[in-house]
Amino acid sequence: MQTEPYIQPMQSPDFKPILCIVGPTGAGKTHLAMSLAEHAQSIGLTVELISMDSALVYRGLNIGSAKPSKEEQATVIHHLIDILEPTEVYSAARFAKDAKQLCEDIRSRGNIPVVVGGTMLYWRAWAHGLSSLPPANTDIRARLDEEGKSLGWPAMHTKLAQIDPETAARLKPNDSQRVQRALEVFEITGKPMSALLAESPSEDGREGSVIPPWINLVSLEPSDRKRLHLNLEKRFDEMLVGGLLEEVKTLKANVALHADLPAIRSVGYRQVWEYLDGQTDWEEMRYKSLAATRQLGKRQLTWLRAMTGRNTFDPFNPNELKAALDFCKRNLV
């Protein structure tokens, strides 16, 4: 059986630790990264940003993903944006491999890599490596997909609970992608996914881990949750006014796309897709989108607050936001 190799983190004594800007959705990560890149340009340095966001990899997901504008991408070099069609799947393992290679390539050009984003599974894979889970088996996956369509994913979730109750307990019954993957792993290896993850060569990959010394983590953590939620509500309403509905209509016009694809399951896109399918009305779509966005932010903060060694700043405090930028400037080179 072939497995994806454990990805060793970069540890080079020739360079300072890599800056990584993280935070919950709506915390201002992109703004901080762009300010840092513009400062670097003003002193003759070049920062290249590596996106750590599972939605930004997809072409056509622009408005709902808060993708950096064409002007921003023209001003500062961005990587791992618009690299896939929404029919494709991008994994944490692939991100870890791509980010590692990009950091090496950027430094070989004499430039400075800065990783920015909030997809914490990508963070875990890049910072701590991955357990040796088997790669996808197309035959098994296709059969499980057919079973899921026939029996329904809640029934498949029940099946998973019988062989891997620990994994089933943390997955929603309709999370077809992850339920399918857990069943696939069991069929390939004969072991529950939870058992394989427990055998990971790096326990540091779990929540509560110490940040590796080759990363300088800047974490934007808003202290005012109510203000964050209001900002997220305002941003989503601006997305709706800015054409999110039309963007999802365009995606739906592609017959190769469906609601179970990872791209379409992205927060906001899934809810608008359901609305266009007639499953919800406008108010329910908006409510579900905002609830999903808040839940995403809560999960991101849970990940971050469990980490020791991070450099934390409140983006809603002007003095702390300035301190965050100053910290990044000091740690560029």
From Swiss-Prot:
CC cofactor: Mg(2+)
Entry keywords, A to Z: ATP-binding, Magnesium, Nucleotide-binding, Transferase, tRNA processing
Region (Interaction with substrate tRNA): 53-56, 177-181
GO molecular function, one term: tRNA dimethylallyltransferase activity
Residues bound to ATP: G23, P24, T25, G26, A27, G28, K29, T30
Protein residues bound to substrate: T25, G26, A27, G28, K29, T30
Site annotation Interaction with substrate tRNA: residues: T119, R141
Signal peptide: none
Top-level taxon of the source organism: Bacteria
InterPro entries (UniProt xref): Dimethylallyltransferase (IPR039657), IPT (IPR018022), P-loop_NTPase (IPR027417)
Biological process according to GO: tRNA modification
Catalytic activity annotation: adenosine(37) in tRNA + dimethylallyl diphosphate = N(6)-dimethylallyladenosine(37) in tRNA + diphosphate
Coiled coil: none
Top-level class of the enzyme under EC nomenclature: transferase
EC numbers, comma separated: 2.5.1.75
Function summary: Catalyzes the transfer of a dimethylallyl group onto the adenine at position 37 in tRNAs that read codons beginning with uridine, leading to the formation of N6-(dimethylallyl)adenosine (i(6)A).
Assembly and interaction partners: Monomer.
NCBIfam families: miaA
Family: Belongs to the IPP transferase family.
Protein name: tRNA dimethylallyltransferase
Organism of this sequence: Polynucleobacter asymbioticus (strain DSM 18221 / CIP 109841 / QLW-P1DMWA-1)
